[in-house]
Design a protein with these regions (language model features):
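Alpha-helical membrane-targeting segments
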Residues: 57-61, 135-144
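Gly/Ser/Thr-rich loops at beta-strand to alpha-helix junctions
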Residues: 25-28, 93-100, 135
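Flexible extramembrane linkers and terminal tails adjacent to transmembrane helices
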Residues: 84-86, 110-123
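Short, surface-exposed "cap/lid" segments of acyl-processing enzymes
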Residues: 1-56
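Conserved alpha/beta-hydrolase fold motif
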Residues: 89-95, 127
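Active-site nucleophile loop of the alpha/beta-hydrolase fold
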Residues: 124-137
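Short glycine-enriched nucleophile-adjacent loop
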Residues: 100-111
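Catalytic nucleophile-loop/oxyanion-hole region of alpha/beta-hydrolase
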Residues: 53-85
């Protein structure tokens, strides 16, 4: 699994948008950083990571679940450390790698009431999907 990278503008506070970005399968951090740099220039704090190939298309969900948990745990920790626990939260899922993260968060109710990350779910103000309108399955995933 790739690392999780936090990037913040020089000035941020309780109302600064916090955007969690799950990158596409095969992305390099330098490519994903171009997107988060744009968000940072608009005044957003960002957290980014890329899910590994095996986890994306494994018939077992444990790797995808661990990736989603790790991303949300890092978001929770960063928001608390930065005094942004109540800031608006946006989730951005890019192509098949990112959309598998969304699928997993939804399947396991991670952000729902009673879910492991319900504290974050209460602050989600929007979700952005980039380049993955298809329902992800092991059969169509490699084609998307």
């Amino acid at each position: 699994m790739a690392g999780v990278v936090l990037d913040a503008p020089d000035v941020f506070g309780e109302t600064t948008p916090f955007v969690v970005v799950a990158g596409w399968l095969g992305a390099k951090d330098r490519n994903l950083k171009k997107y988060t740099d744009e968000l940072k220039a608009m005044g957003c704090c960002t957290l980014r990571s890329i899910q590994g190939s095996w986890d994306c298309f494994s018939p077992l969900s444990s790797g995808r679940r661990e990736f989603a948990r790790r991303l949300l745990t890092k978001a929770r920790e960063a928001r608390a450390t930065m005094g942004m626990s109540k800031s608006p939260l946006y989730l951005m899922f890019m192509s098949n790698g990112g959309c598998w993260a969304h699928c997993t968060m939804t399947q396991f109710g991670m952000l729902d009431s009673g879910g492991e990350f319900e504290d974050l779910g209460a602050h989600v103000k929007g979700k952005v999907f980039d380049s993955s309108p298809a329902k992800m399955t092991l059969r169509n995933g490699p084609k998307v």
